[in-house]
Amino acid sequence: MKGATVTRADLCEAVHEQVGLTRQDCAELVERVLELMCQALERGEQVKLSGFGVFQVRSKRARMGRNPKTGEPAAIEPRRVIGFRASQVMKARVDQALSR
């Protein structure tokens, strides 16, 4: 996997090379895992991957903001957002890799 962004195709190729499944099976596997994660988030559940991190839906309250062009106050409606919190293991691993 090269470049600044890892894509679905990159994940499929890595699974193909390391596990030995066909490229088609790898693509289906990656798609199914991502679909299951999306379904869990749609139900409001957390997706916890041990040693990696937690994806969760968070509620943001209504607040006053500003229109960046005009500077006028603007109401921002309450909404839900998806958040990710990296595990301590992941944080340490990335920190170590980037400090080399």
UniProtKB/Swiss-Prot annotation:
UniProt-listed GO biological process terms: DNA recombination; positive regulation of metabolic process; regulation of DNA-templated transcription; regulation of translation
InterPro entries per UniProt: Hist_DNA-bd, Histone-like_DNA-bd_CS, IHF-like_DNA-bd_dom_sf, IHF_alpha
SMART domains (alphabetical): BHL (SM00411)
GO cellular component: cytosol
Keywords linked to the UniProt accession: DNA recombination, DNA-binding, Transcription, Transcription regulation, Translation regulation
GO molecular function, one term: DNA binding
Pfam families: Bac_DNA_binding
Transmembrane segments: none
Protein's job: This protein is one of the two subunits of integration host factor, a specific DNA-binding protein that functions in genetic recombination as well as in transcriptional and translational control.
HAMAP family named in the record: IHF_alpha (MF_00380)
Family statement drawn from the similarity comment of this UniProt entry: Belongs to the bacterial histone-like protein family.
Oligomeric form and interacting partners: Heterodimer of an alpha and a beta chain.
Protein name: Integration host factor subunit alpha
